[in-house]
Amino acid sequence: MERSEKLLSRENSVLVIVDIQDVFLKPIKVRDFTVENIQLLAQAAQRLQIPVLATTQNAEKLGALAPEVAEAIDDAPVVDKLCFSCLASEPFAQHLQATGRSQVVLVGVEAHICVLQTALDMLKAGYAVHVPYDAVASRLKRDWKYALLRLSHSGVMVSAVESVVYEWLYEAGTDSFREVLPLLKAREQARQEAEESDEEEESEEVETPPTEDANEEAEEATESPPTSETGSEE
């Protein structure tokens, strides 16, 4: 059976990690969540022999790649740039072309600036671009939301981290599946433990009537991919 061209394949994919630097990560509320998802993708890519490229923005002044991501990508190329679109950097464009891959899984920060500009330039250059919503972030949730809406409307495939990994794997029962499955199980276990911890903290708090501020904070804390309906609410 011929697979849909809208699905990723490990033979055609490259993972691009954009500007995961502490200076950009610190103001982001979902920093740990985003970085952990990027680590998972990087580790899965390494095990599946999928090329990985990373960028930094003006590293001399803004700092190097965050240590946890630098460790996850091992010796993959890291290209420093000043332009916001990665593809506008000639060294990066050369590295990307050298991979020979046509599908780009694009992750990093910020969703509405460097990720967005890079994705749209890659589309124009003929790449199929996939952006997992849970591996990109912005300082403000509304910026993240509208970036993903704009990308989706422009032809980018907005996806999820697990979707990406399972599309790479294609089927169960293989050596590749057995090699990557522990990463997925560890991620699920960590998420369950985090949820249980949150529930315990909530149960210890004194119940008070909700306020408008509390409702707004709860909404901001909820991470879900944007839709046209959610976009119209803002």
Where are these predicted regions, by residue range?
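The conserved SAM/SAH-binding core of class I Rossmann-like methyltransferase domains
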Residues: 18, 55, 132
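Short acidic, Gly/Ser-rich segments with clustered Asp/Glu that frequently serve as metal-coordination loops
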Residues: 22-27
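Active-site-adjacent betaalpha module
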Residues: 2-14, 60-234
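N-terminal nucleotide-binding beta1-loop-alpha1 segment
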Residues: 14-20
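A short alpha/beta connector and helix-capping loop motif
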Residues: 10-13, 28-53, 59
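Short glycine-rich phosphate-binding loop at a beta-alpha junction
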Residues: 53-54, 105
